[in-house]
Amino acid sequence: MYFCNVFQTKYRNMLRIAVQSKGRLFDDTMNLLAEADIKVSASKRTLLVQASNFPLEVLYLRDDDIPQSVASGVADIGIVGENEFVERGEKAQIIDRLGFSKCRLSLAIPKKIEYPGLQWFNGKKIATSYPNILRNFMKKHNINADIHVITGSVEISPGIGLADGIFDIVSSGSTLVSNNLAEVEVVMKSEALLIGNWKMDEEKHQILNEMLFRFEAVRSAQDKKYVMMN
């Protein structure tokens, strides 16, 4: 999609966006920027890269560092998974729901177990990388579980005797199947969010509004294409 680029000379400041440095969310984010005719060289994977035709700086970070970077003002805006945004609890504003990188946070247990309901987790040990979301969910439902916080390879925990069940991201469910686990409760659905620090100056707000206009144009074009195909 082509947009008329008059912004390099119009603005003195640059908007800084924090994005995930690798993985599915990185790929989806770069695709969105490309569709919005914002040219960022993916080959220059340094920490900070400037778009060649739009007043935007791209700051590459780990996904769990993005909410804090936006809340603290290191970045003006960021694209992050809703799961990470909710887990971190940082004070940033949700500007837009982007509709990609969709997944869910779910409870799963060994598939050989006949699951009677949420009360099964009372007194059980649950491995997760999202303790805050899980703790709030368990408190809401009056479940007293032992939350064991680990990073990475959460799905192997029941198989090695580390936990009775897990609370983790699920996309296709294939990872659960390969580890003999069954998804029993969907706690939260997640997608990519555009978050922002509203302490930006007026000029940066104008740049942000232009970016949002382009993102909406991309979505509208995708919707029309989908309708035509069906």
Describe each model-derived feature in a short phrase.
Residues 11-56, 80-93, 97-104, 111-230:
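Small-molecule-sensing regulatory modules
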Residues 50-68:
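Active-site-flanking structural segment that lines cofactor/substrate pockets
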Residues 64-69, 74-90:
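Pocket-flanking alpha-helical
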